[in-house]
């Protein structure tokens, strides 16, 4: 009897000793610069499918990167998600990401939408298009990014700061196509055409174009869709005054950027991190991830209304600016 009690006590001790390890395997610590309502369903579905609980910290990109760096080897973060290839490249250049070996991710995410060493992956895409006031310009006047620097547009162009990652990424893509000298000349021409000093975000540029404060600007596509889908009649009415051009259809195509993420080098839950990244590449998650910010799925086989809508409206050729950042580490 005594020996049976000893064996039982030993078994119970071993079982309780395993509990912390098992609990750790069922947790994912996510640092995310995304904050959309649809993400709640995205995360809860992952937990329901895998049993892995997500602990999420949201914040601005720069703040999260700085936090990860300050936490160092003791950081609890497993996955970092952000927007824009330049921000992913910056985190990678700081040595924050670890390569992920995953057949699922390599098969689902196109090569041009992931880091060559699989340090990070795109999970949605957006285009940086030209917008113009329909009463003042024709689409042919601004058919290409080059047109934004032409003297004919002097005093007619609005822009957010050139130092913003969205514009930095566009500039990097143009360097990839034109080279540094031509891109610098183009940038000087763009500055010479400013109707006012750069200010605000993309939505502010759309409003300025619609109001006639300037004739032309550039914007990420999801800002346009937000206004088109707005519950405010004045937003939808404003969009009737704005035309959209998918630039450079006769050459290299419209600049495409991404939202994405990767597994952190110091991740304490690496298996959970890989499972989560693979989940983000699933058909179900791709729809949630893209629709949350009116973007397109990174997985080309995923059907999505936004993709079909814009193809009907003239998007025939697009190019990603991701490659330049991947090679610049």
Language-model features and meaning:
Residues 19-23:
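Sec/Tat signal peptide C-region and signal peptidase I cleavage site
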Residues 24-89:
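Early extracytoplasmic/lumenal segment of secretory-pathway proteins
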Residues 31-34, 98-106, 116-117, 120-121, 132-134, 140, 146-149, 233-255, ...:
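Short beta-strand->loop
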Residues 75-80, 98-132, 146, 156-159:
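A structural signal for short loop-to-beta-strand junctions that line the ligand-binding cleft
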Residues 88-96, 115-143, 171-172, 256-262:
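Periplasmic solute-binding protein
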Residues 166-167, 173-247:
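Ligand-binding pocket segment of bilobal, Venus flytrap-like solute-binding proteins
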Residues 259-318:
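Mature extracytoplasmic/periplasmic domains
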């Amino acid at each position: 009897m005594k020996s049976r009690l000893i064996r039982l006590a030993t078994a119970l001790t071993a079982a309780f000793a395993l509990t912390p390890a098992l609990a750790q395997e069922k947790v994912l610590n996510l640092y995310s610069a995304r904050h959309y309502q649809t993400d709640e369903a995205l995360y809860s579905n992952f937990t329901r499918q895998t049993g892995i609980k997500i602990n999420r910290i949201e914040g601005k990109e720069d703040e999260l990167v700085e936090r990860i760096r300050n936490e160092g080897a003791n950081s609890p973060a497993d996955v970092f998600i952000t927007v824009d290839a330049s921000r992913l490249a910056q985190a990678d250049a700081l040595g924050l990401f670890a390569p992920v070996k995953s057949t699922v991710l390599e098969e689902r995410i196109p090569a041009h939408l992931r880091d060559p060493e699989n340090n990070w992956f795109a999970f949605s895409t957006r285009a940086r298009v030209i917008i113009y006031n329909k009463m003042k310009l024709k689409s042919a006047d601004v058919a290409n990014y080059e047109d934004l620097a032409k003297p004919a547009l002097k005093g007619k162009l609005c822009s957010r700061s050139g130092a913003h990652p969205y514009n930095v990424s566009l500039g990097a893509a143009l360097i990839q196509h034109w080279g540094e000298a031509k891109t610098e000349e183009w940038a000087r021409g763009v500055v010479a055409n400013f109707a006012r000093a750069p200010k605000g975000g993309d939505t502010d540029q759309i409003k300025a174009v619609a109001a006639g404060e300037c004739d032309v600007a550039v914007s990420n596509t999801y800002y346009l869709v937000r206004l088109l889908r707005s519950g405010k009649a004045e937003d939808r009415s404003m969009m009737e005054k704005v035309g959209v051009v998918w630039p450079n259809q006769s050459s290299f195509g419209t600049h495409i950027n991404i939202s994405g993420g990767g597994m952190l080098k110091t991740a304490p839950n690496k298996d959970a991190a890989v499972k989560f990244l693979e989940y983000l590449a699933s058909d179900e998650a791709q729809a949630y991830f893209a629709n949350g910010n009116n973007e397109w799925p990174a997985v080309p086989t995923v059907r999505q209304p936004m993709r079909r809508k814009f193809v009907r409206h003239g998007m025939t050729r697009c190019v990603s600016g991701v490659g330049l950042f991947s090679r610049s580490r």
